[in-house]
């Protein structure tokens, strides 16, 4: 059990919240840098167990962009709304896929089933990610962020912690872990006012 929950236990830092808003990533506008992705599997081909959120282990992901072309990946589990944040040093597909594979690889097998992403160029090497993690990637329709509703909602919550125009290169992974812990310890109406952390613990028991 300890090995399953080690990624939940990170130190919590203080003074994280701010009322300012986060800059929207470039991937959400018409000049997103999206392009044709080889061997892309459409979100429309996702099985029913993903659509109805019945089975844990299916994730939604996105790349947030800050000042000076800095980036953070957000990962939200659809069943529990559990959130992970990953600092990304560069936006090229090799760097992004490697960072995501490393983070997903920390999870127990039952939490590694699928990932839904938009059609940004950073996921061109999605097959490499799948080989490394055994996690299938599904791609949203162009400019359709609502198809990753849990992820979009979480990105909105993150605006309370990360100021608009922040240079993410100045933010440590430990700081991101603390923000994620705050989100995961917040009761959610959609979860019957349980927390994502509690829901995930129940899955792992």
Question: Model-flagged regions — what are they?
Answer:
Residues 49, 57, 165-166:
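Glycine-centered loop/turn motifs
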Residues 51, 64-84:
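Short conserved beta-strand segments at catalytic cores or DNA/RNA-binding microdomains
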Residues 56-65:
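Two-metal-ion RNase H-like nuclease active-site motif
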Residues 62, 75, 81, 100, ...:
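Mobile genetic element proteins and their domesticated derivatives, centered on retroelements
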Residues 65-69, 85-109:
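Active-site beta-loop-alpha junctions of metal-dependent nucleic acid enzymes
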């Amino acid at each position: 059990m300890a090995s399953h929950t080690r990624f939940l236990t990170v130190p919590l830092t203080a003074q994280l919240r701010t009322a300012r808003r986060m800059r929207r990533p470039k991937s959400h506008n018409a000049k997103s840098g999206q392009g044709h992705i080889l061997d892309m599997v459409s979100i429309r081909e996702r099985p029913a167990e993903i659509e109805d959120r019945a089975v844990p282990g299916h994730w939604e992901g996105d790349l947030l962009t800050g000042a000076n072309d800095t980036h953070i990946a957000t990962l939200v589990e659809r069943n529990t709304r559990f959130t992970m944040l990953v600092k990304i040093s560069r936006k090229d597909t090799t760097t992004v896929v490697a960072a995501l594979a490393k983070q997903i690889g920390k999870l127990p097998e039952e939490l590694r089933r699928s990932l839904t992403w938009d059609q940004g160029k950073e996921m061109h090497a999605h097959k490499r990610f799948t080989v490394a993690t055994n996690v299938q990637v599904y791609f949203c329709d162009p400019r359709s962020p609502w198809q990753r509703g849990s992820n979009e909602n979480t990105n909105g919550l993150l605006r309370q912690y990360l100021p608009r125009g922040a240079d993410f290169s100045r933010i440590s992974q430990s700081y991101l872990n603390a923000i994620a812990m705050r989100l995961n310890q917040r009761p959610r109406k959609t979860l019957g006012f349980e927390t994502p952390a509690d829901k995930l613990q129940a899955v792992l028991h």
